[in-house]
Amino acid sequence: MQSMTIFNIITQLVFLSKTLNGNLSVQPVFQTLDGYEYTSQSFSQNLQSESQLEIVYEWKYLDFLYSTFVQRQQSILNGDFVPKNNLPLGIDVHNNRLFVTTPRWKNGVPASLGTLPFPPKESSPAIKPYPNWEAHGNPNNPDCSKLMSVYRTAVDRCDRIWLIDSGIVNATINLNQICPPKIVVYDLKSDELIVRYNLEASHVKQDSLHSNIVVDIGEDCDDAHAIVSDVWRFGLLVYSLSKNRSWRVTNYNFYPDPFASDFNVYGLNFQWLDGVFGMSIYYNKKIMERVLYFHPMASFKEFMVPMNILLNESVWQTNTQEYAKYFIPIGDRGYNSQSSTSGVTRNGIMFFTQVHQDDIGCWDTSKPYTRAHLGKFHNMENSNLIQFPNDLKVDKEKDQNVWLISNRLPIFLYSNLDYGEVNFRILKANVNKIIRNSVCNPDNSYINTSKSAFVLIEEGQCF
């Protein structure tokens, strides 16, 4: 057990006393936490009034842009398009286009990747298949050179979009691997195919599900690596563009936490044993290296590993046990803080989804990963603006934005969506505006004290 300083004990007892007496009007005081000096303020009220989340698109159900009305009707009649079986999962942004993935969870999904214009011209547009209809295969007559079931994407600084195509259809009924999982890359300037790479069979386990992808660019655009998460068999696949080769990375921190595997949302109770999922890459000033921040979906913790460990292929061809020490936990978000995806801004602000809380959170990566340094934004009871935030991206604009897809996935999987109301949303917020009054603003010098003293003791002092 780590010892507590007398100052921290007194601070927490005073806070507990005021909390029990119902007196929450605490004047700002200066205190030191983890080597930083802060002004104690409750920042959550400021965030609620200035959340700055803006609805870009919303749908009761999805539609696709067919060449003619007759083609659309024919697709519905033959079962290729069943509107209620389509759900948006992944989001990405490049210039004046949004990219949305629609994996083939069920029958009747005609295309698994499409685009939408930005700025929007209407509130609920049909999705235009990307790059065209011909690029998408039919699961009833599979052509594995085509796109089958794209889960998520990554846009890099070289104007390319990277896709992870799971090759799995009907995952909600009977997991059917009809094509090998593959990485596909398109040139966003020409929309031409650049790369199609099937993951090596020896790296794909029984019931593997490859569901997320991030990309690291070195000194030039050829020095690129994609990192793909295997959420059901708890591994990472690293692909080298220059070598056109991949390797599998394993570590016990990729596994789900049983205590975080129980979900209770929207009146539904279910268990997800999803392993490593959320990933983002940034330069860590403390160790002076680029790192991969990651977390399993069924977890309350965040981890990191130096990128040079992941990108060294020879490490993963020998005894990997000696490298386990480089995969380290950096902090805990707290109970019911499961997160799917994350993204980091150019100045080191990480945003992450909070799927159990219908919210997004943030963290300034230059500060310790403790709950005192984690912010929330939406944080409003009885609001349906966000319902299961499933994917999140930070764009590459000069004035950056954070983008979010809310899609009610558990209801889609385990119950029935009400198609008389809005089920899916794409939302965005300007980064500078949304963090202005938050603990995540690097220019602010206060911490999150809007929780009980018991949480402060649990997270910061007694391990």
Swiss-Prot record:
Gene3D superfamilies reported in the protein's UniProt record: TolB, C-terminal domain
Pathway: Pigment biosynthesis; melanin biosynthesis
GO CC terms: extracellular region
Pfam family, any one: MRJP
SUPFAM superfamilies: NHL repeat
GO BP, sorted A to Z: melanin biosynthetic process from tyrosine
UniProt main location, coarse: secreted
Domain of life: Eukaryota
Subcellular location: Secreted
TM region positions: none
Family: Belongs to the major royal jelly protein family.
Protein name as annotated: Dopaminechrome tautomerase
